[in-house]
A protein has these predicted regions:
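Acidic, mature catalytic/reactive cores of soluble proteins
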Residues: 1-378
Length: 378
């Protein structure tokens, strides 16, 4: 179910809609995408990407790339006192009229942005590929089996490497072998589906290949050099590689220590072939370090953008006498709605909570929300 749910976001959020989520997709009587979106939708799409990463459907690099595109688009959208407007056209990026600020939408988006920020910051210290890699790929395989009526597809590969999905700290060699076996098998399965499959089965087969390819690329680029260092007699003497997949911070620390030692070893190396091999290895390590540094920079940028985009002015929505938020604000008429959210059970409570946490409104506002009780008859 989670894999199929992510497929909606994966398939419909892309360049055609400026990496914003369409409000809905109509299947009948004819397929149609609603090219409009709201702040709540945008926040949900960011959290869906974060969840997809947690489930192993997206690599860290993919998560950062998709999120950066969405946040960059958000910075282009018209806002009012920091608030995103109620609706935008996802292709023109223009607001839909009448322009309106919804208290509920603003609260939902702010909460999503701040939650997303915390999730992104955790990527510094998480392994670049975790046990979720295995679980995410097996989820996709399960859907593919369902769509193709081939329950035994990839069974041997999955069984041979099931330890990857049962340990929190994945061995680098295990992940590498798993992907080396699964990718060609997935490509062969896709070729078969292109001949005998349906549109849906072909899409899922292509998705499996992409998942494998993206995971393999990230693992190879960031860590592919580690086994070469560990297996080389001269290098392994001066630097012992960890057997488990490192985090981005680990990679930066490891290469900080290793590169100066490797440079010294290269200078002292007399054999031309060995020296050439070490120079090529040094290049791969520098590429890995550069990629890790760029990913860390992207995390920093995304976190800062989230803080900035969740920073609203609340004075025009908030009634300080009652400690209540108005339902919203009509930007066209410069008019605050007279109705207020006065119940804890209302959909505005998340916005109230976030605004208090940001220090924008007093804590008394939380306790001002009504908490009516009723007799259940029990």
């Amino acid at each position: 179910l989670t894999r199929k749910t992510w497929a909606f976001f994966e398939n419909l959020i892309g360049p055609d809609d400026n990496w914003l989520p369409p409000d809905n997709y109509q299947e009948n009587p004819e397929p149609r995408i609603a090219h409009r979106t709201s702040p709540t939708n945008i926040g949900l799409s960011l959290l869906s990407s974060l969840a997809a990463h947690d489930f192993g459907y997206l690599t860290t690099l993919q998560l950062l790339d998709r999120s950066q595109k969405t946040l960059s688009t958000m910075q282009e959208l018209e806002r009012y006192k920091g608030h995103f407007l109620n609706w935008y056209h996802t292709q023109t990026l223009l607001p839909l009229y009448p322009r309106y600020v919804s208290t509920v939408d603003s609260g939902n988006l702010a909460a999503s942005l701040l939650t997303f920020k915390e999730g992104i910051l955790s990527l510094y210290t998480l392994p670049v590929l975790r046990d979720d890699l295995y679980k995410g790929l097996t989820d996709t395989i399960a859907v593919l089996r369902e769509k193709t009526k081939e329950p035994g597809a990839f069974q041997k590969i999955i069984e041979d490497h099931q330890e990857i999905g049962t340990t929190a700290s994945v061995r680098l060699s295990s992940a590498k072998t798993f992907l080396e076996k699964l990718l060609p098998a997935a490509e062969a399965f896709l070729d078969k589906q292109k001949t005998i499959g349906t549109t849906e089965s072909i899409w899922w087969a292509e998705t499996l290949v992409k998942q494998c390819s993206n995971a393999s690329f990230e693992l190879t680029t960031l860590t592919g050099w580690m086994q070469d260092v560990d297996q080389h007699p001269k290098l392994s003497e001066v630097f012992r590689m960890p057997v488990h997949i490192p985090s981005l911070n680990d990679l930066m620390n490891m290469t900080d220590v290793l590169l100066p030692r490797l440079e010294k070893t290269i200078l002292n190396e007399q054999g031309p072939e060995e020296k050439e091999w070490m120079i090529e290895l040094e290049s791969r390590i520098r590429n890995a370090r550069l990629m890790a540094a760029e990913m860390i920079e992207s995390i920093d940028t995304l976190a800062k953008q989230c803080i900035e985009l969740a920073d609203y002015q609340y004075d025009f929505l908030f009634d300080p006498a009652q400690h209540f938020f108005s339902i919203g604000y009509n930007v066209e008429d410069h008019r605050r709605d007279p109705g207020c959210y006065d119940l804890l059970g209302s959909e505005a409570r998340l916005g109230v909570y976030v605004a208090i946490a940001q220090g924008k409104i007093p804590q008394e506002s939380w306790f001002a929300l009504g908490r009516q009780l009723t007799n259940t008859g029990k």
